[in-house]
Amino acid sequence: MKHNNVIPNGHFKKHWQNYVKTWFNQPARKTRRRIARQKKAVKIFPRPTSGPLRPVVHGQTLKYNMKVRTGKGFTLEELKAAGIPKKLAPTIGIAVDHRRKNRSLEGLQTNVQRLKTYKTKLVIFPRRARKVKAGDSTPEELANATQVQGDYLPIVREKPTMELVKLTSEMKSFKAFDKIRLERTNKRHAGARAKRAAEAEKEEKK
């Protein structure tokens, strides 16, 4: 070794050049995927290209639970509230997830409204062209129907308006992370503290 150069420390195998991963097929793969998408769109016509309608859900864990995204499927409760039978839903392009549970009224109402909006825009083709059943769309609607490309009923993330206020010394001294930790600790010990307080009250009465 001489001069101020990097000390070589490459941990290579003896014939490492024979095992280098190449990506020469990348442009062709891109073309192949595009053609496959076009073929699928033709095959599933007149259904939307992006698949069935999915619900709006909140992400899991403390990091993501403030963000909304599309979920796997609508709950049976949501379908019932929107007046859609659970057996019919998958046949008209609505994803169903029997395992998911509604944990808030707001979430339930949002998805019920989403389903109702979808129903108003839905065009149902008859299974057999000559046998039109109840619930199928009119011939005029069928003639004007087009295949939806890309996302439909996209999630609109509203940005809250910011209100500018003057900084006070109290605001500057406030430690948000410490406050969150304190409140989380209080929540964790709430049951034990309540029990201890009840026992102390019982002792005083004696």
Curated annotation (Swiss-Prot):
According to UniProt, the name of this protein is: Large ribosomal subunit protein eL13z
Keyword annotations from UniProtKB, A to Z:
Cytoplasm, Ribonucleoprotein, Ribosomal protein
**Xref: Gene3D superfamilies:** 1.20.5.110
**Similarity comment:** Belongs to the eukaryotic ribosomal protein eL13 family.
Q: Which InterPro entries match?
A: Ribosomal_eL13 (IPR001380), Ribosomal_eL13_CS (IPR018256)
S-S bridge residues: none
Where do the record's region annotations for Disordered lie?
185-206
Q: Where in the cell is it found?
A: Cytoplasm
The record ties this protein, via HAMAP family, to: Ribosomal_eL13
Keyword presence, Glycoprotein: no
Which GO molecular function entries does the Swiss-Prot or TrEMBL record give? mRNA binding; structural constituent of ribosome
Listed under GO cellular component are:
cytosol; cytosolic large ribosomal subunit; cytosolic ribosome; nucleolus; plant-type cell wall; plant-type vacuole; plasmodesma
The record's Gene Ontology biological-process terms are: translation
Quote the PROSITE patterns the UniProt record gives: RIBOSOMAL_L13E (PS01104)
Superkingdom of origin = Eukaryota
Chain intervals with Basic residues compositional bias: 186-195
Q: Where are the transmembrane segments?
A: none
Q: Which Pfam families match?
A: Ribosomal_L13e
Ribosomal protein: present as a keyword of the record? yes
Compositional bias of type Basic and acidic residues: which residue ranges? 196-206
